[in-house]
Amino acid sequence: MYKRQAETGKNRVEEAEKASSKAVKAAIDYIRENYKKQISIEELAKLCHMSDGHFCRMFKKYTFKTPVQYMNSVRLSAAMDLLTRTDRKVLDIALDTGFNSLSYFIGVFKQGLGCTPTQFRRH
C-alpha cells in the first residue's frame, strides 16, 4: 500500500515537472516571437498559468537564466544581427529589438559583450 502511494506521489511530481517544462517552453516560444514588444513577467506567468514567483523559479530552473536575462539575450542577438547587416541608427535598433531606452540597451550590450553597440559595429 505504501509503495503504491509512493509511486502515485512520484507520478504526480513527474506530471508537474512535465507541465512546468511545457509551460516554460511556451514562454520561450512567446519571447522569441514577441521580443520586439514590451513583455512583462506578469504576462509570461499568466501565459503559463503560474504565479509570478513560481514562473520565475521554474524559468530559471530550466534555462539557467531569469526571464529578463533570457529576453535580453534574444534581443541582443537580434540587435547584433542588425548592427552587422545594416547602417541603421543604434537608437532605432534598440527600440526595434524591444529595448525601451537607448541607455538600457547600451548597458545590457556592454554587460553582455564587453563593448558598446557602436564599438561592436566598428569591429
Q: Model-found features: residue ranges?
A:
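Residue-level marker of regulatory loop/turn positions in helix-turn-helix DNA-binding domains and
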Residues: 16, 20, 33, 48
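Short acidic-aromatic loop segments in the C-terminal HATPase_c
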Residues: 110
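Terminal helix-turn-helix DNA-binding modules in bacterial transcription factors
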Residues: 25-43, 60-106, 122-123
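An amphipathic alpha-helical interaction segment
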Residues: 1-15, 19-26, 54
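Intrinsically disordered low-complexity regions specifically enriched for long asparagine
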Residues: 3-5, 52, 56, 106, ...
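Helix-turn-helix
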Residues: 43-52
